[in-house]
Amino acid sequence: MIKEKNNLSLTKSILLILISISIAVGGQILLKIGMNRMGNIAVNSMSSLGHLFLGVVKSPMVLVGLFMYVISAAIWLVVISAVDLSFAYPFIGLTYVLILIVSKFILKEDVNPIRWAGAAIITIGVVVISRG
């Protein structure tokens, strides 16, 4: 499960995985907030692509969200250099759970019981896979 070349302990590996996931979730939330401020964008022509690009460049929320993705990816590269991908990757499922929680409590989105049940199943799945 853990490769010796980078000498990461299991605890440190899991911590880095969770940090990477949390930063990615934070980035996704900032992207959503930034895009909500921009409004709906219909990409049906080159001019609308230009409008999207200009909107992104002018939006601090979107730019910071994208930067957070870069940081998350850098941490992820450290993780997968040290642990098996089959161990690390299932933790990505926790992004769905965290997005659900943050969407409910920060973005004030409606989350129905079926989604909560799905989040519970995902969490159980990640725990089972990580112990295997």
Q: Model-predicted segments: where are they?
A:
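Polytopic alpha-helical membrane proteins, predominantly small-molecule transporters/carriers
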Residues: 2-132
